[in-house]
Amino acid sequence: MSDERYAASDGGGTEVGSGTRGRTTVVTKPATRPQRPTGKRSRQRAANASNTGANVEVEESSTQAAIAKEGKVKKPKKSADRSANPIVFIYNYLKQVVGEMRKVIWPNRKQMLTYTSVVLAFLAFMVALVGLADFGLAKLVLLVFG
């Protein structure tokens, strides 16, 4: 959803000038990072990601060239400490789950009411459809087999 729709209600998003003949002008505030994710990618973050991607490729190619010069490929050793303690594994897993749940964009009250009413209306329609089909087939069976 677009944030411009809600900007007029909070008083900071759109302003109508006296000589604009009813056209609106969108006034944006300086880019600040929101407290919670909004679901939109910021331009600054996208630009940083493209710059770091180029740096990583350069580093990888230089590392591969150094390994090719040596002629030996060393395999990294797996640490035995990672799988040793299942309690630490569960703790880390739950910590990651909480971190991912914080990234989720939760619906507001209006969206929840809309989604709930749509689901309940669909449920009522399907119950009526199945009920009528059952009733009709029961009557048909009674007519055929008497």
Swiss-Prot record:
PANTHER family in alphabetical order: PROTEIN TRANSLOCASE SUBUNIT SECE
Membrane topology: Single-pass membrane protein
Biased composition (Polar residues): 45-54
Keywords: Cell membrane, Membrane, Protein transport, Translocation, Transmembrane, Transmembrane helix, Transport
Record flagged with keyword Mitochondrion: no
Cysteine disulfide partners in this protein: none
Feature: compositional bias, Gly residues: 10-20
Subunit and partners: Component of the Sec protein translocase complex. Heterotrimer consisting of SecY, SecE and SecG subunits. The heterotrimers can form oligomers, although 1 heterotrimer is thought to be able to translocate proteins. Interacts with the ribosome. Interacts with SecDF, and other proteins may be involved. Interacts with SecA.
Compositionally biased region (Basic and acidic residues): 69-81
Main subcellular localisation: membrane
Source species taxonomy: Bacteria, Bacillati, Actinomycetota, Actinomycetes, Mycobacteriales
InterPro entries: SecE_bac, SecE_sf, Translocase_SecE/Sec61-g
Protein name: Protein translocase subunit SecE
Family matches, as PROSITE patterns: SECE_SEC61G (PS01067)
Homology family: Belongs to the SecE/SEC61-gamma family.
Region of interest: Disordered: 1-81
